[in-house]
């Protein structure tokens, strides 16, 4: 039998979110709005297991991200490898980045090699986006 392209496991999603301390109405809404509900609940569980954030914060980040599994991995990797004073900041940055796993690698690598604090590495890596140079055509006159 072929595996389904999506998971429709809304009961497990709700059960995991309730066990994580999410209010029943919030758990029901988050699972109901999700295309892949267990990705949301797994993300929340992963974030809560790795960090000291509020369950509601984890739910907001996980349910509003295109890659909830990577958000949990990002938070987990940063907490495993670095001293973290502000878990909420780590969660916020892992949620804000487009590629959470790559972002975590940047944060850990910069912190370890440049001797930055975790907070400095979070800020440096989130600001290190792609900046194209010498884009043609230029709208500046070449007089």
Each model region followed by its residue ranges:
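General marker for long, soluble alpha-helical cores
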Residues: 2-143
């Amino acid at each position: 039998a072929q595996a389904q392209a999506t998971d429709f496991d809304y009961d497990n999603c709700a059960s995991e979110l309730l066990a994580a301390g999410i209010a029943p109405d919030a758990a029901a809404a988050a699972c109901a709005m999700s295309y892949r509900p267990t990705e949301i609940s797994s993300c929340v569980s992963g974030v809560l297991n790795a960090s000291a954030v509020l369950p509601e914060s984890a739910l907001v980040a996980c349910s509003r991200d295109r890659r909830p599994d990577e958000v949990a991995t990002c938070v987990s990797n940063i907490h495993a490898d670095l001293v973290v004073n502000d878990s909420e900041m780590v969660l916020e940055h892992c949620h804000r980045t487009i590629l959470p796993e790559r972002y975590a690698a940047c944060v850990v690598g910069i912190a370890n090699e440049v001797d930055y604090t975790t907070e400095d590495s979070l800020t440096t890596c989130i600001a290190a986006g792609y900046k194209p140079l010498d884009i043609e055509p230029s709208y500046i006159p070449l007089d």
